[in-house]
Amino acid sequence: VIDAANESAAALVNLLAQDFSCFRDEHVFEGRRKPVRILKRAQILVADLWACFEGEGYGDFRDIDKITMFADYRVPQILNSMGCISYSPPLDTAIWMKRDIPSGSSWEMQLRGKAVSSQTARRRR
């Protein structure tokens, strides 16, 4: 799979998601036709390969900069505490009351999307 990606981090992320269901982190968001693809695990694997091999051999990716931040639940917590992102009042209440936020739910997708979006905007500055 690594060889098939032709030294492309983005291609390897997509191949991992295509060929291995455990890397297919995507959900339909509020009725949209195309799923939102976060692909956190696939991106972490690619970033780990790059780091472990110090950008050489199996870690030689010409587009490693295409990998986004890894959108899990911790990053939005930290960004919110720093004032970088805010939650809608209903979501803020649900978090404060420690309610479960199901995987693939609208709230989960909003949290993860906000985290990626805020860091992408920060990186462009």
What is each of the regions a protein language model found here?
Residues V1-R125:
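HhH-family (HhH-GPD) DNA N-glycosylase catalytic core used in base-excision repair
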